[in-house]
Amino acid sequence: MITVNPDGKIMVRRCLVTLRPFRLFVLGIGFFTLCFLMTSLGGQFSARRLGDSPFTIRTEVPGSPESRGALRKMSDLLELMVKRMDMLARLENSSELHRTASVAHLAADRLTPGASLIERIQAIAQNVSDIAVKVDQILRHSLILHSKVSEGRRDQCEAPSDPKFPDCSGKVEWMRARWTSDPCYAFFGVDGTECSFLIYLSEVEWFCPPLPWRNQTAARTAPKSLPRVQAVFRSNLSHLLELMGSGKESLIFMKKRTRRFTAQWTKAAKYLAQKLGDIRRDQKQILVHIGFLTEESGDVFSPRVLKGGPLGEMVQWADILAALYVLGHSLRITVSLKELQSNLGVPPGRGNCPLTVPLPFDLIYTDYHGLQQMKQHMGLSFKKYRCRIRVIDTFGTEPAYNHEEYATLHGYRTNWGYWNLNPKQFMTMFPHTPDNSFMGFVSEELNETEKQLIKDGKASNMAVVYGKEASIWKLQGKEKFLAVLNKYMEIHGTVYYESQRPPEVPAFVKNHGLLPQPEFQQLLRKAKLFIGFGFPYEGPAPLEAIANGCIFLQSRFSPPHSSLNHEFFRGKPTSREVFSQHPYAENFIGKPHVWTVDYNNSDEFETAIKAIMNTQVDPYLPYEYTCAGMLERINAYIQHQDFCVGPSPLPPGASTAQSPFVLAPNATHLEWAQNISSVPGAWPPTHSLRAWLAAPGRACTDACLDHGLICEPSFFPFLNSQNSFLKLQVPCDSTEWEMHHLYPAFAQPGQECYLQKEPLLFSCAGASTKYQRLCPCRDFRKGQVALCQGCL
């Protein structure tokens, strides 16, 4: 039989008796809190506010004194409860000295729920504090609303019948049924009354006309724009490094890259400043939101930075940030959804309401992940401000995939399209899609002394394989061509591994493991050959190798890779066919720096290796991939691209008194007439336009390249008329306006001319043997394909 000290027994009984009413009281408080929350917020819980004391009621926001007083009393009572629990705990601890070990153990076990109870009380107190904040926000808006509503009469709050606002009555019906579906409506003052619906729909959104009895100064008006500040080139990048933040391996990599290129950015800024002279450049307010680095998107890149994962996106983003900053613009950089919401002015709720303030940014640079996040949280403001967005899009987005209605009707399926943006708002890593804007990145530019040192230090029989992940080395048939290469050259790899050599890498390959960027550069400076296995596509490494004096050898794809036959491209918003691992290197650089061969043909491969060993090349870097080239290009985009302006100059049915085109002397194409000035505000300038009728089955991209020119989609509206066909002496027995990404075009059977009905579908890409496409082309600057001769 166990004996129990009477004092200890009494102590335990007292604690248990004391705790029972506390439990009942806590249940009551919890039930009251839930009811209060549901009635005040339409059933929507507010997010927890981190960093505040769980017993702090924030009273700086004006609201209802009664509501705040009740919440304060609840919070004070909860605090008192916790203090009593603490006193009980101290009393119990002091009595332990007078108990036996067994009784102390029993009492401790019986009192354990007290600690859990304290935690529950603290959690309820935190929720009460959060509720107070939300209630204050709602009351702030609703009090203003009620004071204004009281000025009018009840019959003045009926949905008006105004033909200028055909959706008003339908929106009011929707608000009656769904206004509690998102707390953001209550945040803007909606309380379930007809007046609150109409005020919201006329002053926050724009579906209803302003109410005549409302004080119009109370409606939200855009603040007066401040005078523009002139952008000044920067040479010190230390503040940019602070703006970029830290904490992620991807950000650390980007900051290291920016530091390494600081001297080259500074030199490029001085060069461009002299080139532009006294041209005024307005400073833009720019938000850069790197969506793929947010936790909400998964941030799959950061964990792989140190394991040989792809770095192309981070290379490009680091260079974009540096270029924008060096050009003198004001930057905000976000890599989390919370930061994005704060900078945009997103109201609390589920993202159905517009922003609380006019968008404070002239431009927003983001990616597809960021684009999706903005659409989810900006409400109607996304449609209003999407013309300011620039989307960094590695592989490009063709117009047929961008136009939601057209893509859906014609089966252009994609995981990333349907945005209805101007296709030029998508910015690519390489200039493979003229429908988009070429953003690019930079590679290290060498001076003449460095180039000579590299040439003198080259090993004639050293090859480096392009591919840092072991999965790239799983290519079927690689043993065959690697055996041929091994006969002539020493093969080096930079494949990541933790402890054991990757089994995919043959024994005769000298694997250095994953190298830091400076050491990898040194390896390239010694090597003769940089060889690709067909993947990854269109990355920055081949350009870095060529810039360091290597010859790049890559595989020719037959048939070409595309979304129709290759898993990597499936779901991407493009039908582009890729004929090699790096089409830009093949088409814009070519031999002797770039060799493209059939790896399945051993004789062709071996012949190429022998020729490469006897070929001497200098380090080479296209101007458009230097710091100066990228600064020049981005500056031109910022100063001239404006996608918020009106529609195309020649809408359907329009005609001009005088055609701006003349037939070229050889009668092959159209040119802009010398006696007609360029269209004001048009960029590129219209005097650079050349129009050709492509052969059947030929895309405008290829038709322009055939003549040494670049397809320029912004010129399509000027050609989109029957006059253009007449000037080219093309007989049009009939002319039709339709929505099709291949128009304007001429169909030989029936002598039919087709004009484009939807400006967003003007497309350089796309071909059909049925049509001869009318193609707008332009010239371009040497080494800067994105800009025409007169584009600066």
Curated annotation (Swiss-Prot):
The chain crosses the membrane at residues 25-45. Present in brain (at protein level). Predominantly expressed in hippocampus, superficial layers of the brain cortex, striatum, nucleus accumbens, a subset of nuclei in the thalamus, inferior colliculus, brain stem and cerebellum. It is found in: Golgi apparatus membrane. Residues 46-792 are lumenal. Its EC number is 2.4.1.-, 2.4.1.155. InterPro entries: GT18_cat, MGAT5_Glycosyltransferase. It catalyses: N(4)-{beta-D-GlcNAc-(1->2)-[beta-D-GlcNAc-(1->4)]-alpha-D-Man-(1->3)-[beta-D-GlcNAc-(1->2)-alpha-D-Man-(1->6)]-beta-D-Man-(1->4)-beta-D-GlcNAc-(1->4)-beta-D-GlcNAc}-L-asparaginyl-[protein] + UDP-N-acetyl-alpha-D-glucosamine = N(4)-{beta-D-GlcNAc-(1->2)-[beta-D-GlcNAc-(1->4)]-alpha-D-Man-(1->3)-[beta-D-GlcNAc-(1->2)-[beta-D-GlcNAc-(1->6)]-alpha-D-Man-(1->6)]-beta-D-Man-(1->4)-beta-D-GlcNAc-(1->4)-beta-D-GlcNAc}-L-asparaginyl-[protein] + UDP + H(+); 3-O-[N-acetyl-beta-D-glucosaminyl-(1->2)-alpha-D-mannosyl]-L-seryl-[protein] + UDP-N-acetyl-alpha-D-glucosamine = O(3)-{N-acetyl-beta-D-glucosaminyl-(1->2)-[N-acetyl-beta-D-glucosaminyl-(1->6)]-alpha-D-mannosyl}-L-seryl-[protein] + UDP + H(+); 3-O-[N-acetyl-beta-D-glucosaminyl-(1->2)-alpha-D-mannosyl]-L-threonyl-[protein] + UDP-N-acetyl-alpha-D-glucosamine = O(3)-{N-acetyl-beta-D-glucosaminyl-(1->2)-[N-acetyl-beta-D-glucosaminyl-(1->6)]-alpha-D-mannosyl}-L-threonyl-[protein] + UDP + H(+). Disruption phenotype: Brains from mutant mice display defective biosynthesis of O-mannosyl glycans. Mutant mice that lack both Mgat5 and Mgat5b display no visible changes in brain anatomy, but their brains display defective biosynthesis of both O-mannosyl glycans and N-linked glycans. Keywords: Disulfide bond, Glycoprotein, Glycosyltransferase, Golgi apparatus, Manganese, Membrane, Metal-binding, Signal-anchor, Transferase, Transmembrane, Transmembrane helix. Residues 1-24 are cytoplasmic. One of its GO terms (biological process) is protein N-linked glycosylation. Signal peptide: none annotated. Its cofactor is Mn(2+). Disulfide bonds join 157-195, 168-208, 184-353, 387-644, 700-775, 704-777, 711-764, 732-753, 788-791. Belongs to the glycosyltransferase 18 family. Glycosyltransferase that acts on alpha-linked mannose of N-glycans and O-mannosyl glycans. Catalyzes the transfer of N-acetylglucosamine (GlcNAc) to the beta 1-6 linkage of the mannose residue of GlcNAc-beta1,2-Man-alpha on both the alpha1,3- and alpha1,6-linked mannose arms in the core structure of N-glycan. Also acts on the GlcNAc-beta1,2-Man-alpha1-Ser/Thr moiety, forming a 2,6-branched structure in brain O-mannosyl glycan. Plays an active role in modulating integrin and laminin-dependent adhesion and migration of neuronal cells via its activity in the O-mannosyl glycan pathway. PANTHER family: ALPHA-1,6-MANNOSYLGLYCOPROTEIN 6-BETA-N-ACETYLGLUCOSAMINYLTRANSFERASE B, ALPHA-MANNOSIDE BETA-1,6-N-ACETYLGLUCOSAMINYLTRANSFERASE. This is Alpha-1,6-mannosylglycoprotein 6-beta-N-acetylglucosaminyltransferase B.
